[in-house]
């Protein structure tokens, strides 16, 4: 992708939708499960290469069709009854889990909890003509899954309908939805999928309209200086977990062929990413700045707290859009308190130790407006 765009790999941000009804790409886990010379790995790598090739070809073609941009508008609208926090505090101090489908009434009917209720939209214009719209919203994007069919789910349905009705190319990004689901309002059936899609589409339309809930920012491209357009990155050094279910020796025993496949699969994913960290892998957070618009791209499944932190640390007149689900090998990460909570789900699939300070430092570094420290940031 970087070669096709004529840039370097640190200037590429690749985010996933995370809708669950889709393949997981994890070559390290496949190697551990099936071996280096296995047909499964060969097919896995072939599929990955095909995705990379088709995406790169599309990038090459797009460079032949560049169009001028005269202004960029940042707007937002509140989403009605879609998202709710997955971690539901209980009277005894424990944390209950409100999954994407929740049958237990007391958990399902609890208050929404901490979310970011706003869907944010970036609209790129050539004169009065809309060229493309990017939408950002923080929730797990699935209503139901596991029936062996690939689906773009409710968010994809909303995006597709928005594109059809507007005639404008639409892109949807999942924000920091690690601890946010549709479980309060979703019954896990086709009717609920349709309802969630309808509510998301309504927010997209309101955010895109002239009477949007909030026209937050307009960038006049002609007034920009070269220094007003920046791409920067900051490292997030996730740490290996080796306690409890993440113990390397325990994971080795769980990879035994006699173990149930789901046990082996989990052990392979845990072991594969843990080894990547031991080998020195460092994840990156990136930020595109165009005038007073900042677009942040984060790895893994970040908690909504980090999206809200980004909005707080940015200067007052900035319009902030945050996309999660970049490098997803780390799975979940959130406030350090999740590691001492009683109950909850996300920390059982967090492949990093406490990292709140590191993530907040990366966001602060990317979102300040002063001169950026050269050892941490590379501007392109």
Can you name each region flagged by the protein language model?
Residues 1-380:
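Non-catalytic substrate/cofactor recognition surfaces at enzyme active-site rims
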């Amino acid at each position: 992708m970087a070669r096709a765009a004529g840039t370097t790999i640190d200037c590429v941000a690749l985010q996933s939708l995370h809708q669950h009804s889709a393949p997981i790409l994890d070559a390290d886990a496949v190697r551990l499960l099936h071996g280096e010379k296995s047909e499964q790995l060969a097919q896995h790598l072939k599929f990955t290469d095909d995705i990379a090739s088709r995406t790169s070809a599309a990038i090459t073609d797009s460079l032949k069709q560049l169009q001028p941009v005269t202004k960029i508008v940042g707007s937002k609208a509140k989403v009605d009854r879609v998202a709710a926090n997955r971690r539901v505090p209980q009277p005894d101090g424990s944390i209950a889990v409100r999954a994407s489908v929740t049958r237990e009434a007391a958990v399902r009917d609890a208050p929404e909890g901490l979310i970011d209720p706003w869907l944010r939209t970036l609209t790129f214009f050539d004169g009065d003509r809309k060229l493309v719209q990017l939408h950002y919203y923080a929730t797990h994007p699935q209503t139901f899954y596991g029936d062996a069919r690939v689906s773009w789910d409710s968010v994809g349905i909303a995006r597709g309908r928005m594109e059809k009705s507007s005639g404008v190319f639409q892109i949807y990004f999942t924000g920091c939805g690690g601890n946010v689901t549709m479980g309060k309002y979703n019954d896990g059936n086709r009717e609920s999928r349709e309802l969630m899609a309808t509510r998301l589409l309504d927010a997209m339309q309101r955010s895109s309209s002239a009477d949007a809930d909030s026209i937050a920012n307009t960038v006049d491209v002609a007034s920009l200086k070269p220094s007003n357009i920046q791409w920067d990155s900051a490292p997030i050094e996730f740490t290996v977990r080796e306690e409890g279910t993440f113990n390397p020796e325990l994971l080795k025993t769980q990879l035994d062929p006699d173990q149930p496949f789901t046990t082996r699969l989990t052990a392979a994913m845990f072991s594969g990413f843990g080894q990547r960290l031991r080998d020195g892998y460092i994840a990156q957070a990136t930020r595109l700045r165009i005038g007073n618009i900042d677009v942040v791209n984060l790895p893994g499944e970040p908690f909504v707290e980090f999206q809200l932190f980004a909005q707080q640390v940015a200067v007052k007149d900035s319009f902030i859009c945050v996309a999660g689900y970049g490098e997803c090998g780390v799975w979940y990460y959130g406030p350090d308190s999740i590691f001492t909570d009683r109950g909850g789900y996300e920390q059982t699939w967090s492949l990093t130790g406490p990292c709140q300070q590191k993530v907040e430092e990366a966001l602060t570094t990317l979102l300040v407006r002063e001169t950026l420290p050269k050892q941490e940031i590379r501007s392109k």
